[in-house]
Amino acid sequence: MAVDHATDIRRTITGLVLAAIVVLALVLRGWVLLALILLVAALGLWEFFSLFWGNKRIPSRVCAIALGWGMLTLTWAHRTQDALVCLGAGFVLAAMSFLFRWNEVEEEGVPAFAASGIFMAGLAYIPLLLLPATYLSTTKLIFVLAAVAVSDTSAYFVGTRFGHHKLWPRVSPNKSSEGAVGSLVGCVIFCTIYGACLGRASWWAFALLGIAINAFAQLGDLFESALKRAVHVKDSSNLLPGHGGILDRADSILFAMPMFAVVDQWFFFF
């Protein structure tokens, strides 16, 4: 794969700015961190729906963002049971939309049932998977975010310089097997060092955790690539120079963070 130095520079600058914003939010926590999470959720939902609806169905987007914000804010306020009610309310609204429009076909040729499914998929994909960001400790958030960042960065730079074998051409023609291996190695090394310095578990436990985080991060990346492939777009948006959209940047985190949150409940890595 050819190396584009201009893209590398844009990608690096954007990455540093994003890292600074995230670090500041993690240091201040409280309402600042919640505001950043809500912003990511809103932009991510907007991009997700744009993949399928273009610039249409604005009321549905606003409704989904409001429900997603409710889920995240209530979880942040330690009212998880109430947060799940927002997800249930989303299903009821989607079901009502289908009930009253079940025999209609919209201008894009999308049946009402498919539109309702897209609405629910957006709620489950973004705000639901972002919930751990509202309650994980700063140490844990830094760990999982940095592990995913190392995975993505290693995959990009190894893939662009040494990638010759396609990983899954039908899903993502630009991803290489070499990049996937580089991503795995980089993530495992980072997790092992981070765990040895700040963790409670053994180094090999963190190495295994690094394998799991990387596996889910790559699955999240491939899932979002498949979504874009299905609707024939390259990026979810052009909001972030060198990176694409919010979903292009957060796709790996959306899969890796919930997995880590569940595993940490059982094995107490920190």
Can you describe what each PLM-predicted range is?
Residues 150-161, 217-229:
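Short helical (or helix-break) motifs at transmembrane helix termini and adjacent helical loops
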Residues 154, 181, 247-255:
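Membrane-embedded alpha-helical segments of transport systems
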Residues 123-124, 128, 237, 254-255:
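Hydrophobic alpha-helical transmembrane segments of integral membrane proteins
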Residues 230-253:
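Interfacial loop-to-transmembrane junctions
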Residues 254, 258, 262-263:
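Hydrophobic alpha-helical transmembrane segments of membrane transport and translocation systems
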Residues 262-270:
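Juxtamembrane boundary at the C-terminal end of a transmembrane helix
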Residues 2-211:
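Membrane-embedded alpha-helical bundles of polytopic integral membrane proteins
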